[in-house]
């Protein structure tokens, strides 16, 4: 939707995580409803950092991204988005340069920029679709009430062979793992912007990281280790009995 697209344009923080082949790090210089300016690093070793600026006209669904300094300085990418229907959006992308480009290199610039923008857009579509799906799930979970105080997950020996097991419940999605010999459960949804935590691996420090923005959480307590957002939703308790694993929602 257009709402997700405008939300994505303002979200500078996702660049090194969703677009890891194009960016390795980013730090915000300033931001607001007008857009943002940030310093971004590239994966290529030895490449100079870029200062990027995105200016957004929310009323017109229009934004322009400019390379203020660093590789590609002076390049501008202007995007106009138009709604065709509730689920279809047409975008018009145009490339400009505030510095003169030799005529024999114009085609190369256009090809490189077109390929990179197509990749970035495809990666963003996955994020925007995932975000909308997560919002729909949250709305449904808010309406639901669990009729059971306990849910059977499955055979504990079989589950132990898997790195993780995702359990859908009427009130949320949870990930069940065996950590250091103990069964635990944690929310499979990031508390920041609802990023997916169902396919994450456990880091060496016992944390898990959101693939959208890199926010880290203690897998056992749910605490956000970056101090940037609230803790993960409280998970149900894991109970093992007679070779079976259960999620218990009893207090």
Which functions belong to the PLM regions below?
Residues 1-154, 158:
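C-terminal catalytic domain of Rieske-type non-heme iron oxygenases
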